Regions:
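Long, low-complexity ectodomains and other extracytoplasmic segments of secretory-pathway proteins
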Residues: 143-164, 245-271
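Terminal connector regions
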Residues: 178-179, 217-264, 317-341
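Intrinsically disordered, low-complexity Pro/Gly/Ser/Thr-rich segments with frequent PxxP/GP/PP motifs
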Residues: 190-231, 293-320
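Buried hydrophobic-core signal for structured, non-transmembrane domains
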Residues: 175-181, 237, 273-279
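Substrate-binding clefts and catalytic carboxylate motifs of secreted carbohydrate-active enzymes
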Residues: 1-187, 203
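Short solvent-exposed strand-capping/beta-turn motif centered on an Asx-Ser/Thr pair
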Residues: 180-186, 196-198, 278-284
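Extracellular Ig-like/FN3 beta-sandwich strand-entry sites
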Residues: 172, 188, 230-234, 308, ...
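C-terminal accessory/binding modules appended to enzymatic or scaffolding proteins
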Residues: 263-306, 312-314
Length: 341
């Protein structure tokens, strides 16, 4: 199914289809700036430059990425932020599909994402670039394909009024949570949810008991948030089993470009192989990077509420944690920092 991407359909279009098995679907993104620097000079770093278009197999795809960015994010303030936004788009596109297909296990019994890696440094459908750097999609796929997944089918402007200049009409602001269980044992636990404001203060919260059958799934009771401003609230959720969070996520009810983010004032510190990120407000798609782009973490490109979140550096052939506790070599960003505000 290539309606999303080649057909320029919105990500929510996946939810109109209930395939038995999906043999191929995907979405493009650019590699990180550190990879792009290896095949460009300063004057080439524009997505419509000759060099950037030559490093693109799909005709007119760079413009397609920009079109999807315009539907989702404020205009990126520079070339680097545009590359970053493209990776967030790619991860969200595939997540919309995979989570939907997993919510209807029994109808859909499998899906194959196009594609894993690249044979040259290029903008592509890959989740791992030519140099082995993980894009946002690769981190997201670790979670969306995990044996146990808590996911959310949200309803709001995203699926009912994606274009703000259409005639006013009522918007259903609600959510349906689902636990997918691909293990051979029932999953017994608790789903906890919180409806939060941009400053991470809680509007309302609740919990549901879960008993998801082996190789099956379970829908949670419908969550009705009508009366809430979709630009001012977001939903966070987690599945707790035996005291451990085994799956979690968050969702907006409008496009990120319209959400009323508060400045998260992100900061990062490093101690050995432990990276700690601090946020003063809700931050979406938080990414920690190094200047040379070879940092690999146990998780990245994550949403986080106000507070701290820790990540672990995973040593690779090009990188070891030893002697890397110099904060100046690291940077952290989120959707908030991608645009001039």
């Amino acid at each position: 199914y290539w309606g999303v991407w080649h057909g320029s359909e919105p990500f929510t279009a996946y939810r109109s289809h209930h395939y038995r098995f999906l043999s191929e679907f995907g979405f493009q993104s650019f590699p990180a700036l550190q990879t792009v620097k290896r095949f460009t000079e300063d004057g080439d770093r524009n997505i419509f430059s000759r060099v950037m278009e030559m490093h693109q197999r799909n005709t007119a795809a760079n413009g397609k990425i920009l079109n999807y960015i315009s539907q989702t994010y404020l205009y990126p303030k520079n070339f680097d932020e545009l590359l970053y936004c493209s990776q967030l788009l790619q991860a969200d596109a595939i997540r919309y599909g995979v989570e939907h297909f997993r919510r209807f296990r029994g109808t859909c019994m499998g899906a194959v994402v196009w594609q894993l890696n690249d044979i040259w440094p290029v903008a592509s459908w890959a989740s791992v670039d030519y140099y082995g750097n993980w894009k946002a999609l690769q981190y997201a796929e670790k979670k969306m394909f995990a044996p146990v997944l808590l996911s959310c089918e949200e309803h709001g402007e995203i699926d009912q009024k994606p274009f703000v200049n259409t005639l006013p009409h009522p918007i259903d602001v609600s959510a349906d949570l689902h636990v997918a269980n691909e293990t051979g044992e029932p999953i017994v636990g608790t789903v906890k949810w919180s409806l939060c404001r941009p400053d991470s203060s809680v509007v309302k919260e609740g919990a549901f008991e879960v008993n998801a059958p082996a190789y099956g799934g379970q829908w949670m009771p419908h969550l009705d948030f009508n009366g809430q401003d979709p630009l001012e609230v977001h939903l966070t959720y987690e599945l707790v089993v035996d005291g451990n969070v085994v799956s979690s996520g968050s969702t907006l009810f409008c496009a990120p470009k319209h959400y009323h983010f508060a400045d998260p004032k992100l900061s990062v510190s490093v101690d050995g192989d432990t990276v700690t990120v601090t946020a003063e407000n809700f931050a979406k798609s938080v990414s920690v990077e190094t200047e040379n782009g070879v940092l690999r973490l146990d998780d990245n490109f994550v949403d986080m509420e106000a507070g701290t979140k820790t990540f672990r550096i995973l040593p690779t052939a090009d990188f070891t944690a030893k002697g890397t506790g110099v904060s100046g070599a690291y940077r952290v960003r989120s959707v908030y920092e991608t645009a001039e505000r």
